[in-house]
A protein has these predicted regions:
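RNase H-like polynucleotidyl transferase catalytic core
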Residues: 65-70, 156-161, 175-194, 211-214
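An active-site-proximal beta-strand-loop segment
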Residues: 88-118, 124-126
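C-terminal domain-tail junction helix/linker
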Residues: 6, 175-179, 201-260
Length: 260
C-alpha cells in the first residue's frame, strides 16, 4: 500500500506545482527536464529531477512526444562541430501569420558553440536585405572592432539553399566579410540542425501558442524572448549555463575581454 505523504511534502509539492504552472504559462511545451533545469539553475531551487517529473505527471503536465513519419533520404553526413565561439554560425528564417497583415518574417543567426542568438531581423517581406540585417547585427555583436581585425579563425555560416542566402549580394557580403558559406542539401538536413532546433523552440514558445494581429506586438514579444533565451534559459548542452554565461565563461577562461 502506498504510504501517505507528510504535510511538509504536500506543501512542498504544492509550492513546486505553482512554480511549474507559472513556467508552463509562458512555455507550455517545455518538458520536465527543462523546467527542472530552470528551477535549479536559474531560480536556485534545490529539487530532484524525478520529483518534478512525478508532480508534472500527476497533474497531466507532461509533454507528449508526437510520432512523426520520416522521409527516406540518402546516407547522412555528420553535422559540423563547433569547437569555439564564432566557428560555425547558422542562419534561418521562419514566418508568422498576422491576422490582418499577412505574413511577418523572422530571420535568426545562431552561434552553434554557445547556442546564443546573436542577430535577428523582422520584416513584412522576405528579402536579401532582411537576411543581411540579421547577419550584420551578429557581426557587430561579436566583432565590435571590425571582423577583419577581431576574427582569429575561419568563420563558417550555414544556411539552406533559399533565394536569400544564395543571392549574389548576400554571397558577396559574406565574401567581403571573410565568412565562408556552407549550404545544406535535401539529403543532409542535419547540417543546420542546431539553428533549426532553435527556430522550433521559438515556434513552440511564442508563435504557435498565440494569435498575433500586429507586427509591433510580435516585435516586442520576440525581443523579450530572445533576451530571456540568451540570458535566462539554461541549456543542458552548456552545462546548464545560459548562452551568455557560457560565452562569457569561454572568454574569461581564454583571457579575452568580455563584451558588454
Amino acid at each position: 500500500m502506498k504510504r501517505a505523504q507528510s504535510l511538509s511534502v504536500v506543501k512542498r509539492n504544492q509550492m513546486l506545482l505553482e512554480q511549474i504552472k507559472e513556467i508552463k504559462t509562458d512555455h507550455p511545451l517545455w518538458g520536465y527536464r527543462r523546467i527542472w533545469s530552470y528551477l535549479k539553475y536559474r531560480q536556485g531551487i534545490a529539487v530532484n529531477k524525478k520529483r518534478i517529473y512525478r508532480i508534472m505527471k500527476e497533474q497531466n503536465l507532461i509533454v507528449t512526444q508526437l510520432v512523426r513519419l520520416k522521409a527516406r533520404r540518402g546516407p547522412m553526413h555528420p553535422k559540423p562541430h563547433a569547437d569555439h565561439p564564432n566557428h560555425f554560425w547558422g542562419i534561418d528564417m521562419t514566418k508568422i501569420k498576422l491576422a490582418s497583415w499577412g505574413w511577418l518574417y523572422l530571420t535568426v543567426v545562431l552561434d552553434w558553440h554557445t547556442k546564443e542568438i546573436i542577430g535577428h531581423s523582422l520584416s513584412l517581406r522576405s528579402k536579401t536585405d532582411d537576411w543581411l540585417d540579421a547577419l550584420h547585427m551578429a557581426v557587430n555583436n561579436r566583432f565590435p572592432n571590425g571582423i577583419q581585425s577581431d576574427m582569429k579563425e575561419q568563420l563558417f555560416l550555414i544556411s539552406d539553399n533559399g533565394c536569400q542566402p544564395t543571392s549574389q549580394r548576400f554571397m558577396m557580403n559574406c565574401s567581403l566579410l571573410g565568412i565562408k558559406q556552407i549550404f545544406t542539401t535535401w539529403s543532409n538536413p542535419k547540417c543546420n540542425s542546431d539553428t533549426e532546433r532553435v527556430m522550433r523552440t521559438i515556434k513552440e514558445d511564442i508563435i504557435w501558442c498565440y494569435d498575433w494581429d500586429h507586427p509591433f506586438n510580435f516585435e516586442v514579444a520576440i525581443n523579450k524572448w530572445i533576451n530571456d533565451y540568451n540570458n535566462d534559459f539554461p541549456h543542458q548542452a552548456l552545462n546548464n549555463m545560459t548562452p551568455t554565461q557560457f560565452y562569457e565563461h569561454f572568454l574569461s577562461k581564454n583571457n579575452q575581454p568580455v563584451l558588454t
